[in-house]
Design a protein with these regions (language model features):
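N-terminal beta-alpha supersecondary unit
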Residues: 1-65
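Surface "functional belts" at beta-alpha junctions
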Residues: 22-34, 38, 84-174, 188-189, ...
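A general structural signal for well-ordered alpha-helical segments in protein cores
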Residues: 36-40, 75, 175-179
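Active-site phosphate/pyrophosphate- and oxyanion-stabilizing loops and adjacent acidic/basic residues
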Residues: 44, 76, 94
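Short, hydrophobic alpha-helical segments
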Residues: 47, 179-190
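Phosphate-handling active-site elements
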Residues: 48-53, 79-89
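DPxDG-like acidic metal-binding loop motif
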Residues: 58-86
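A residue-level signal for conserved active-site and pocket-lining positions in enzyme catalytic cores
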Residues: 63, 78, 147, 179, ...
Length: 212
């Protein structure tokens, strides 16, 4: 029986969720800058009166460089203060796991008309393609498929023309999915010191792209 805190800051909507037996608390907010200013107090409120925390799950990338760092730093801070380990989750898998389907395309905006993309079979929990940083038209899977994640907004017409459907609001935070994946993967938890971000793009190039 475990209580897991999930955190996602890979996109413009940052979120956190707490799950456990008979427990499900979720918070999210669209943030332009300074995610830590709203994220940390929101998590403190989620944890108020909750049972003891057993693990923290956090998305480690790909995604917005600065925002990802805030999320991971926050996760490490809470993990260390509670003396628990961290479950590292792909930000693309977290978004895909919000829907059920044989072909689920998870998309995040990578700036400069590109997306971070990966296709999953969420019915079997398998990965159908590698995570890539590419133009949207090059990553569309065979029809039919479901598209999810903030990157959907870059090409809803393109997705529809390729036989894809959009299952959930592209701006919806996957924080609850992150917490649930963390619960399933408690045995994969690592000490805070072993957590590393997973960029698909060179960090300096990514920071430059985000400034444009």
């Amino acid at each position: 029986v475990s209580v897991v805190l999930g955190i996602d800051t890979a996109g413009p909507v940052v979120g956190a969720a707490l799950v456990g037996p008979g427990l499900e608390r979720v918070w999210s907010e669209r943030v332009v800058r300074g995610a830590d200013a709203v994220l940390i107090p929101a998590i403190a409120e989620l944890l108020e009166g909750a049972p003891q925390l057993d693990a923290v799950a956090v998305t480690i990338g790909p995604g917005a460089f600065t925002s990802l760092r805030v999320g991971v730093a926050t996760a490490l801070g809470f993990a260390m203060s509670h003396g628990v380990d961290v479950v590292c989750i792909s930000s693309l898998e977290a978004r895909a796991s919000m829907v059920s389907g044989q072909r689920v395309l998870a998309l995040l905006d990578a700036r400069k008309s590109r997306v971070y993309a990966q296709t999953f079979d969420t019915l079997t929990g398998s990965t159908l393609s590698e995570a890539v940083d590419a133009a949207l038209e090059t990553v569309l899977p065979m029809s039919p498929f479901v598209a999810v994640g903030e990157g959907v907004k870059l090409g809803e017409t393109l997705i529809a023309d390729a036989g894809g459907t959009v299952a959930v609001d592209p701006g919806r935070s996957p924080a609850l999915a992150v917490a649930k994946l963390g619960l399933q993967r408690r045995t994969d938890a690592v000490p805070p010191s072993a957590v590393a971000l997973a960029y698909l793009r060179d960090a300096d190039a990514q920071k430059l792209a985000e400034r444009r």
